Amino acid sequence: MKHLWFFLLLVAAPRWVLSQLQLQESGSGLVKPSQTLSLTCAVSGGSISSGGYSWSWIRQPPGKGLEWIGYIYHSGSTYYNPSLKSRVTISVDRSKNQFSLKLSSVTAADTAVYYCAR
C-alpha cells in the first residue's frame, strides 16, 4: 500500500501544480497565403518570467500528428524547428504576461490547429 500511495503522489503532485496555470491562445483565425500568422498566448495563474521554464508553440495539421514549432525560455532565448526557422518568430511580453508567435509567408501547408504550451 505504501508503494501505491507514493506512486499516486508522484503522479498527482505535478498535475496539481500545473492545474494552477492556464494558457489561452488568441489571434487571427484566418490568414491569406503569403501573409503573416500572428498568435498570442496569455498566461494566467503564474508568471511567464518564472525561471526554468520554456514556452512553446506546436501545431497539428488536419489528419496528422503534432508538430513542434519552437519555444522561448524565460530568459528570451529561442529555439525553432529547423524546417520553419526562417519564417518563425516567438517573443515574450512580460508586462502582459504573454508570449507570441509570428509565422510569415504562410501557405496551405501551414493549415493547422495551433497550440501554446509550457
Curated annotation (Swiss-Prot):
Pfam assignment, any one: V-set
Compartments, record wording: Secreted; Cell membrane
Keyword entries, A-Z: Adaptive immunity, Cell membrane, Disulfide bond, Immunity, Immunoglobulin, Immunoglobulin domain, Membrane, Secreted, Signal
Residue span of region Framework-3: 79-116
Secretion signal, residue range per the UniProt entry: 1-19
Record carries keyword Membrane: yes
Residue span of region Complementarity-determining-1: 45-54
Domain Ig-like: 20-118
Framework-2: region residues: 55-71
CC annotations in GO: extracellular region; immunoglobulin complex; plasma membrane
Transmembrane segments: none
Keyword Cytoplasm: no
Residue segments, region Complementarity-determining-2: 72-78
GO biological process terms on file: immunoglobulin mediated immune response
Disulfide bond entries: 41-116
Residue ranges, annotated region (Complementarity-determining-3): 117-118
Main location: secreted
Annotated spans, Framework-1: 20-44
Subunit structure: Immunoglobulins are composed of two identical heavy chains and two identical light chains; disulfide-linked.
UniProt-recorded name of the protein: Immunoglobulin heavy variable 4-30-2
Taxonomic source organism: Homo sapiens (Human)
